[in-house]
């Protein structure tokens, strides 16, 4: 599923291609690209849930969290998110790339991946996908993009 998500993100979003594609057309294109139908369906459902998450009632309890409060991870989150991943999420929040709401959406989407162990690179791409889909997060998306691509180009600040 993650390979399908990466393909979609790089093909349609990061390349500024036409994002308004019919689901059947998209499914056919992904099948022609060699992806399994089940994996395509999982990825499209993952994206649909992402699109719906920022409109949910999550904002009510996230907005109520106090400034400077610390996120405590549930056992199932600790099992899937390494110390490195949790530390990077904290860094992104402290750098104001993520806020409490986008952090929670990222964690939700990460746990929905069908990967037993979530790696730091997986987290970075999911953060970019989340920020791209949350209205008003354009600056945060640009900051995250710079973090991801500067690091992969070997540029150290």
UniProtKB/Swiss-Prot annotation:
Instruction: Report the InterPro entries cross-referenced here.
Output: Smg
Q: What superkingdom does the record give?
A: Bacteria
Which Pfam families does the protein's record reference?
DUF494
Which NCBIfam families does the annotation name? PRK03430.1
Q: Which family does it belong to?
A: Belongs to the Smg family.
State the name under which the record lists this protein.
Answer: Protein Smg homolog
Q: Which organism is it from?
A: Aeromonas hydrophila subsp. hydrophila (strain ATCC 7966 / DSM 30187 / BCRC 13018 / CCUG 14551 / JCM 1027 / KCTC 2358 / NCIMB 9240 / NCTC 8049)
Gene name, please?
A: smg
């Amino acid at each position: 599923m993650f390979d399908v998500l990466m393909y979609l993100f790089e093909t349609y979003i990061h390349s500024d291609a036409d994002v308004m594609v019919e689901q059947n057309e998209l499914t056919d294109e992904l099948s022609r690209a060699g992806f399994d139908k089940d994996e395509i369906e999982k990825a499209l459902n993952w994206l649909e849930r992402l699109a719906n998450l920022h409109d949910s009632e999550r904002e009510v309890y996230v907005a109520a969290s106090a400034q400077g409060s610390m996120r405590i991870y549930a056992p199932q989150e600790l099992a899937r998110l390494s110390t490195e991943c949790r530390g990077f999420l904290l860094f992104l929040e402290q750098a104001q790339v993520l806020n409490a709401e986008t952090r929670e959406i990222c964690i939700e989407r990460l746990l929905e991946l069908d990967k037993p162990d979530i790696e730091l690179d997986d987290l970075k791409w999911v953060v970019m996908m989340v920020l791209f889909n949350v209205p008003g997060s354009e600056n945060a998306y640009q900051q995250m993009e710079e973090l991801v691509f500067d690091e992969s180009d070997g540029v150290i600040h």
